[in-house]
Swiss-Prot record:
It is found in: Cytoplasm. Consists of three domains; the N-terminal catalytic domain, the editing domain and the C-terminal C-Ala domain. The editing domain removes incorrectly charged amino acids, while the C-Ala domain, along with tRNA(Ala), serves as a bridge to cooperatively bring together the editing and aminoacylation centers thus stimulating deacylation of misacylated tRNAs. GO terms for biological process: alanyl-tRNA aminoacylation; negative regulation of DNA-templated transcription. It catalyses: tRNA(Ala) + L-alanine + ATP = L-alanyl-tRNA(Ala) + AMP + diphosphate. Keywords: Aminoacyl-tRNA synthetase, ATP-binding, Cytoplasm, Ligase, Metal-binding, Nucleotide-binding, Protein biosynthesis, RNA-binding, tRNA-binding, Zinc. Binds 1 zinc ion per subunit. It comes from Methylobacterium sp. (strain 4-46). It holds the Pfam family DHHA1. Its EC number is 6.1.1.7. Its main location: cytoplasm. This is Alanine--tRNA ligase.
């Protein structure tokens, strides 16, 4: 028993036999913590269980958790490939007790697993405990029979774990193995502890305290256990190798890389094979869990991982996209343990292929510039920070990629100068922003918010309300009143008007009082909770301190509500049809239509669009209630509500749920559950109808779907029906047959165009205009020179190729004159004459007569063009003269 898959199974089976629930790995995108970039430890999915927020139907658990450390605090990216154990993706095996067993059983279970199940040599094992954790030290002596010198007390934070400044915390005990004196290094706590001889492979965390505030801890009434074992490290130990990259799983991936590049994974480029193998795992699992390459957040980290691997593929000589060809090997090795890899295999492959294709242009350009800039630098020197910043800012070449490219040559980067250049750019942007007047306006809103307080929003329950005017703004400054005919910004104590946010547009309506009538043309939110109404006074005066009645445009609000609820249904339908990688990237909810931007690497096909539309309408027709609850944010996320990464949520959030669906386990579940501050319909049936009206690209890896609901959808479909009837009338067929008839007509047109093109080509090769000789000899070389009309440039090239074949040895010059009088020119030289004649030089001689500039191509075939087709014969004469002079 030493294969990675077998080790994983042995661990989970062992703890299952000891009463632990085997819990599947949670996704790499944390469900219960929108502030965490990636899942980076086994305990992440149990965070709310440890804190008491969430209850589970079990008190013991075991997992094999997929983890990524490649961004923020936990970032191993730069070291990957150059050390024996650094990874961006790794698996953490862990067992957990939620107030059930504690230190005695935790240590006993760990000891029996490593010595009896895994069969490790007891004489090579040693442990660390926290400096004053006498209980753990006593238990290790009792259970393992360790002498005092093999129980090392550590007083640093390495052996005391805490979740944050507050919350559960406790001492740790780490298990080490002595890999032998042939490796440099000393035991933990010694000056040589960073060496490879003593390898830590399992950390046991004893959560026995709660930290109320820094320095103030109290005992937990029910202590818990959290452990983490690196699967890759344990595999290396059991397989008797000193590097994780020499284990069976990594050898399979590295061998697949070697097969693609056609060279063995040895020598100076070993690190490149390791980088590709590691990054392939990270990239594939991230895509499978819904992350796609982008320019911010998780998508940016994924892009960095992908591009670093792709640069190393280029170093190994790969000239075409290669990463996607490795995916089947990864799926074969890990797909049984992680079925999501199997389900997402085609998505992973396509994402890698597209990203590598795009990146090659950036890579080639950036490396060319980097080579030129570092040609005179030697080992130990630094590339200037200004140059590194130019590569980043102008050519899209990230700093870490520049550093990685120079690492093998021992050249560094002046990162301080890079940061200074970055800060100068930011300062310039801030100055430009301040100069635009926006900074002064923002200062106004901060001061106003401080003085009048937050606006109370009543719009979830009401569309009319009374409020007191607390501030008026006109031309960027506060005023006491707005007169009839004036426009400005209105702040009131409370309002039913929704302020634009979360993609939903602001409400419109009216403001009224005795002798006052004003229109609200838009509503926005400033600083999160200050509602600002754009008003135009039509009659009377609007003054600070005045009591007013505010009335929302009901019909417009109803249309917005329908579109917003439809957005939620479409979001979940997209996830179910396309996959779990779908995540919201932006939205717009208006009375007329909705648009929803989401992560997806390629265009949706017609069947996918139809399936999404059908699913959303099926849930709509259930006419189920749309339920809104106020919940603590942790409770909301623990229930499965979708939150946006990076979004700042308050302590209390609105959770909007709608529809029913059948889950994969056959149980009924809520179709859509999202954190949302917008306005929604009361029942899904009020949406009326959802029709998708468009799908397209927004950015790399981001698609946009557009749809209409209710009356807007009905009007759209009626107009589409009228257009279809008009087209069918022109085609003289029933509407149901219009598409087939149109397709047949288009194919007929294409056939006729092909036939016409062929006829023109044959006519052109069959003879020229007046005064042209089909073939003549110039300077001992056969020259075929012709001018033709109505032949496109691509056909001129094929004519030149055909002419070269007819001549066997010679030069072909053809001018094609278009109907608008412009001309194209092609010159071909047979291979036996390219040492004497250059087609590029000949074509340039002719293009001058056509009014063109230059021309380009190869010695055997070149092309040019010009605006003066009337000079076709002059161009041919110039080519003949150039040929004679050559």
């Amino acid at each position: 028993m030493s294969g990675v898959n077998e080790i994983r199974s042995t661990f989970l089976d062992y703890f299952a036999k000891h009463g632990h629930e085997v819990v599947p790995s949670s996704p790499l995108v944390p469900r219960n913590d929108p502030t965490l970039m990636f899942t980076n430890a086994g305990m992440v999915q149990f965070k709310n269980v440890f804190t008491g927020v969430e209850k589970r139907p079990y008190h013991r658990a075991a997992t094999a958790q997929k983890c990524v450390r490649a961004g923020g605090k936990h970032n191993d990216l730069d070291n990957v490939g150059y050390t024996a154990r650094h990874h961006t993706f790794f698996e953490m095996l862990g067992n957990f007790s939620f107030g059930d067993y504690f230190k005695p059983l935790a240590i006993e279970l760990a000891w029996n697993l490593v010595t009896k199940e895994f069969g490790l040599d007891r004489s090579k094992l040693l442990v660390t405990v926290y400096a004053d954790d006498d209980d753990a030290a006593t238990l290790w002596r009792k259970i393992a029979g360790f002498p005092e010198e093999r129980i090392i007390r550590i007083g640093t934070s390495d052996n005391f774990w805490q979740m944050g400044d507050t919350g559960p915390c406790g001492p740790c005990s780490e298990i080490f193995i002595d890999q032998g004196p042939e490796l440099w290094g000393g035991p933990p706590g010694s000056p040589e502890e960073d060496g490879d001889r003593f390898l830590e492979f399992w950390n046991l965390v004893f959560m026995q305290y709660e930290q109320i505030e820094p320095g103030n801890r109290v005992g937990l009434p029910r202590p818990s256990i959290d452990t983490g074992m690196g699967l890759e490290r344990m595999a290396a130990i059991l397989q008797g190798v000193k590097s994780n990259y020499d284990t069976d799983l990594f050898r399979s991936l590295i061998d697949a890389v070697a097969h693609q590049v056609g060279r063995p994974p040895e020598g100076a480029q070993t690190a490149s094979y390791r980088v590709i193998a590691d990054h392939l795992r990270a990239a594939s699992f991230l895509v499978a869990d819904g992350v796609l390459p982008g320019n911010e957040g998780r998508g940016y980290v994924l892009r960095r991982i992908m591009r670093r691997a792709m640069r190393h593929a280029q170093l190994l000589g790969a000239r075409d996209p290669m990463m996607y060809r490795l995916v089947p090997t990864l799926v074969r090795e890990m797909g049984q343990a992680y079925p999501e890899l199997v389900r997402a295999e085609s998505l992973i492959s396509e994402t890698l292929r597209l990203e590598e294709t795009r990146f090659r242009r950036t890579l080639e350009r950036g490396l060319s510039i980097l080579d030129a800039e570092t040609r005179d630098l030697s080992e130990g020197q630094n590339l200037s920070g200004e140059t590194a910043f130019t590569l980043y800012d102008t050519y899209g070449f990230p700093l870490d990629l520049t550093q990685d490219a120079l690492k093998s040559r021992g050249i560094g980067v002046d990162t301080d100068a890079f940061k200074a250049a970055m800060e100068r750019q930011r300062a310039a942007a801030r100055a430009a922003w301040a100069g635009s007047g926006e900074a002064a306006t923002e200062t106004l809103w901060y001061a106003l918010r401080e003085r009048v307080g937050a606006t109370e929003f009543l719009g979830y329950e009401a569309e009319t309300a009374e409020g007191v005017v607390t501030a008026l703004v006109r031309g960027g400054v506060e005023v006491e009143a707005l007169a009839s005919g004036e426009e400005g910004l209105l702040v009131v104590s409370q309002t039913p008007f929704y302020g634009e946010s979360g993609g939903q547009v602001g409400d419109t309506g009216t403001v009224a009082a005795a002798g006052l009538r004003a229109r609200v043309t838009d509503t926005e939110k400033k600083l999160g909770d200050l509602f600002v109404h754009h008003v135009a006074v039509e009659e009377g005066r609007l003054t600070v301190g005045q009591a007013v009645e505010l009335r929302v445009d009901h019909a417009r609000r109803a249309a917005i509500r329908a579109h917003h609820s439809a957005t939620h249904l479409l979001h979940e339908a997209l996830r179910q049809v396309l996959g779990d990688h779908v995540a919201q990237k932006g939205s717009l909810v208006s009375p007329e239509r909705l648009r929803f931007d989401f992560s997806h690497p390629k265009p949706m096909n017609d069947d996918e669009v139809a399936a999404v539309e059908e699913m959303a309408n099926r849930v709509l027709l259930q006419n189920g209630p749309v339920v809104t609850k106020l919940m603590a944010v942790d409770d909301a996320i623990a229930t499965g509500a979708r939150a946006l990464f990076g979004e700042k949520y308050g302590d209390e959030v609105r959770v909007v749920s709608m529809g029913e669906d059948q889950g994969g386990d056959g149980r009924r579940r809520t179709f859509s559950v999202e954190l949302c501050g917008g306005t929604h319909v009361g029942r899904t049936g009020e949406i009326g109808l959802i029709t998708v009206v468009g799908e397209g690209a927004v950015a790399s890896g981001v698609r946009r779907i557009e749809a209409m609901t209710g009356d807007a959808a009905r009007r759209h479909l009626a107009e589409e029906s009228r257009r279809l009837a008009a087209v069918a009338g022109l085609l003289k067929v029933p509407p149901a047959e219009a598409a087939d008839r149109l397709a047949a007509l288009i194919e007929d047109r294409r056939r006729l165009e092909r036939e016409l093109s062929e006829a023109r080509r044959k006519l052109a090769m069959g003879g020229g205009g007046a005064g042209e000789e089909p073939v003549r000899e110039v300077a001992g070389v056969k020259l075929m020179a012709r001018s033709v009309e109505g032949v496109e440039m691509r056909d001129l090239k094929s004519l030149a190729d055909e002419g070269k074949k007819r001549l066997g040895s010679g030069v072909v010059a053809i001018v094609g004159v278009a109907p608008d009088g412009k001309a194209g020119l092609v010159v071909g030289v047979t291979d036996d004459l390219t040492d004497r004649f250059d087609a590029v030089a000949l074509v340039r001689a002719g293009s001058e007569r056509l009014g063109g500039k230059g021309g380009g191509g190869r010695r055997d075939m070149a092309q040019a063009g010009g605006p003066d087709g009337a000079a076709a014969q002059d161009a041919l004469a110039a080519i003949e003269a150039a040929l004679a002079a050559a």
